[in-house]
Amino acid sequence: MPEAPKIAALEVSDESLAEKNKNKLQFIEDVTTNADDVQRRVLEEILSRNADVEYLKRHGLEGRTDRETFKHIMPVVTYEDIQPEINRIANGDKSQVLCSNPISEFLTSSGTSGGERKLMPTIEEELDRRSLLYSLLMPVMDQFVPGLDKGKGMYFLFIKSESKTPGGLPARPVLTSYYKSSHFKNRPYDPYTNYTSPNQTILCSDSYQSMYSQMLCGLCQHKEVLRVGAVFASGFIRAIKFLEKHWPELARDIRTGTLSSEITDSSVREAVGEILKPDPKLADFVESECRKTSWQGIITRLWPNTKYVDVIVTGTMSQYIPTLDYYSNGLPLVCTMYASSECYFGVNLRPLCKPSEVSYTLIPNMAYFEFLPVHRNSGVTSSISLPKALTEKEQQELVDLVDVKLGQEYELVVTTYAGLYRYRVGDVLSVAGFKNNAPQFSFICRKNVVLSIDSDKTDEVELQNAVKNAVTHLVPFDASLSEYTSYADTSSIPGHYVLFWELCLNGNTPIPPSVFEDCCLTIEESLNSVYRQGRVSDKSIGPLEIKMVESGTFDKLMDYAISLGASINQYKTPRCVKFAPIIELLNSRVVDSYFSPKCPKWSPGHKQWGSN
């Protein structure tokens, strides 16, 4: 008899969940059907509430909220254009510089300016918008994979280092902000956010303790796991590599029901203690699977009820798809949403599609969206280079959300509730289709990025400056760099940057290996703070490698490119290569290889903040 109320409650719960899902799907229908009206209202709301903001008054908007006036008067801007305003707020200016609402914190972008993370202003209510987008994901997924409410998600989620601006505002990545918010920590019970990792393990700032405890909890609940994932593909693969290295200790903890003494965070120990119980049978199972020579399909072997892997595999993350396929035995790789530090943008309405066919439907009430047409030069390029400043004609070329054309590429421009106006995000998108009147975009690339392993983004100019700094080590030996290129090597985890160097040797003095190691370290020291954080704090990037190639290698590279149809007159050495045959050609002519001997310098915060 005591069981009857439970069953009744479960039925009500199932019914209300179905109703909730239905309402969320109807919301998507409504906002995509009325996309242009929603966009008009969003812009009016942003401009009316910020009518007295200094930035808008300076440009002469004078409280007007219509699209035509806004587009005519307000310039399209990059981060550098608004950096003076950002710095004022960071330094403690509490006047209405960019936004009428108080700036609650800065979200640190993985994009950089002057080698430092960009600071994106945000306001308290943005958490509601982010939570809204998250709430759409599982109702969409439920249409394709029903029953996910009956089990758990094993997600490896981490917080990153944060700092405070001189004015006392937190500066941290968007996900760190979200995980530390009451929206996440005090979220009401929801079967779709029922994770194997207790909050305390996610919020542990020690990356080793966080990973160890999350993996242990995932193994203890292995039969309940229906989906696995992380934010980026690279992060999920790091978790599997961690298991590969630490399974004996994890199995020992499961066998004895005692958490490793290396886990010293008391809140983590307490949370894991609620889950960890002595289970010799499970320990035997984990050991027998992990001892096998092949780790192919290890995800489906250890977590047999897993339906899919939820990770971002678009853009530069696509390089990890073969590794994920190997570990998961070809489970669907699902990209659910598209977001950045500036704004949360949209959702994937066909989550089980192939990674190459992923497209995101922009949700029209997240921000006001505009699109700058991208005209690509034909030719061999590894990134799309976009002009920094726009001409008056180009400023007028921007089109609204509902006016984009199928197959055309655009750079995304946003106006947000938190004080960004006609801001160039830097993402290049291609129109792949439409959901009602709202376009669906596939992500093409981040503008100007040539190298990326994790959340780092290194562009050609930055790489060139880093190489220029490094070659000063060669001057005493009467040697110079005649040519170079690079690639992101993800064949081992963590991945690392590789540079191919061809030298011109004028002197007779042999160059000691330590000099080339110094070159590696100088390049790393010259790269942006996101790269250096990945090396030092997150351990998501391995030591940089310089491979010395035979004389004449880059002539061979040019010959190869010309044989594929490149124009001899227009050919220039690519500063980054991704095409496997080219990498093979370069590797076949390597004579020596050197790695950075230690981690570069890095500390949280911006260098201009001093010790803050």
UniProtKB/Swiss-Prot annotation:
Record-linked Pfam families: GH3, GH3_C, GH3_M
GO CC, alphabetical: cytoplasm
Biological process, per Gene Ontology: auxin-activated signaling pathway; response to auxin; unidimensional cell growth
Keywords: Ligase
EC numbers, comma separated: 6.3.2.-
Listed InterPro entries: GH3, GH3_C, GH3_M
GO MF entries: indole-3-acetic acid amido synthetase activity
Tissue: Expressed in cotyledons, stipules, true leaves, hypocotyls, and all parts of the roots. Not detected in flowers.
pH and activity: Optimum pH is 9.0. No activity at or below pH 7.5.
Induction field: By auxin. Not regulated by light.
Other comments on record: The gain-of-function mutant dfl1-D (T-DNA tagging) has a short hypocotyl under blue, red and far-red light, but not in darkness, shows an exaggerated dwarf phenotype in the adult plant caused by the inhibition of cell elongation in shoots, and inhibition of the lateral root growth without any reduction of primary root length.
Family per record: Belongs to the IAA-amido conjugating enzyme family.
Record's function text: Catalyzes the synthesis of indole-3-acetic acid (IAA)-amino acid conjugates, providing a mechanism for the plant to cope with the presence of excess auxin. Strongly reactive with Glu, Gln, Trp, Asp, Ala, Leu, Phe, Gly, Tyr, Met, Ile and Val. Little or no product formation with His, Ser, Thr, Arg, Lys, or Cys. Also active on pyruvic and butyric acid analogs of IAA, PAA and the synthetic auxin naphthaleneacetic acid (NAA). The two chlorinated synthetic auxin herbicides 2,4-D and 3,6-dichloro-o-anisic acid (dicamba) cannot be used as substrates. Involved in auxin signal transduction.
Name assigned to this protein: Indole-3-acetic acid-amido synthetase GH3.6
Organism ancestry: Eukaryota, Viridiplantae, Streptophyta, Embryophyta, Tracheophyta
